[in-house]
Design a protein with these regions (language model features):
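Mature extracytoplasmic/periplasmic domains
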Residues: 79, 154-181
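Tryptophan-rich aromatic "cage" segments
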Residues: 177-195
Length: 195
């Protein structure tokens, strides 16, 4: 299994530019009641937001909001369960951001799909088109083909991609310069309520 999610799955800022100015305190209030498609974090909201701010220093509060309400917790839970079976699991986390809407779109929900299928030049509203997204797309689509042929994405142009294990949380972070990182948000996810 190859599983991918994006950094900013449920980012609200691309629809409302005023939300770019949100503060961390305002993010806490927003995630008390609602966290993406899930119920809010209630009394844990401050702990969750602080954990993500610590794990991702230098990120704007709007980005912390998106990271803390993304689907990554579910992706990791699925990978943990699937890794108990004999077939390998590979996990990716898409962080590439299009140069559109003054950067507000970020790595939004499903933007990675056109990269996997070599369609970045057809999805100008998602990527802006051109050489920059195409370079990553070529590597991602070749890696997906390798995975479809062999059950292993290696050999497609991305860095060496180890199988996912719950102990290390090996995750291919997809961006202009892709790299494998061991469970890059593990400490932050510990603050989240259980699924």
């Amino acid at each position: 299994m190859l599983i991918c999610s994006t950094f900013h799955e449920m980012s609200a800022t691309w629809l409302d530019s005023a939300l770019e100015a949100v503060t961390l305190d305002e993010v806490v209030e927003k995630v008390k009641e609602r966290a993406g498609f899930r119920p809010g974090y209630g009394d844990k909201a401050r702990e969750v937001v602080d954990a993500y701010a610590k794990a991702f220093p230098g990120r704007k509060p709007a980005e912390i909001w998106a990271l803390a309400t993304s689907t990554r917790q579910s992706v990791v839970a699925l990978a943990d369960q699937k890794s108990k079976q004999p077939a390998p699991v590979y996990v990716a986390w898409f962080g590439w951001q299009p140069p559109l809407f003054d950067g507000r779109m970020r790595a939004f929900h499903c933007v990675d799909i056109c990269f996997w299928f070599a369609n970045t030049d057809l999805m100008l509203s998602h990527t802006g088109g051109g050489a920059r997204p195409r370079r990553l797309s070529e590597k991602m689509s070749r890696s997906l083909l390798q995975f479809m042929k062999n059950g292993d994405p290696n050999g497609g142009g991305l860095p060496a991609w180890p199988r996912y294990t719950p102990a290390n949380g090996e995750t291919m972070v997809l961006d202009d310069v892709s790299e494998v990182r061991n469970d890059p948000d593990r400490e932050a996810r510990k603050a989240l309520p259980p699924l």
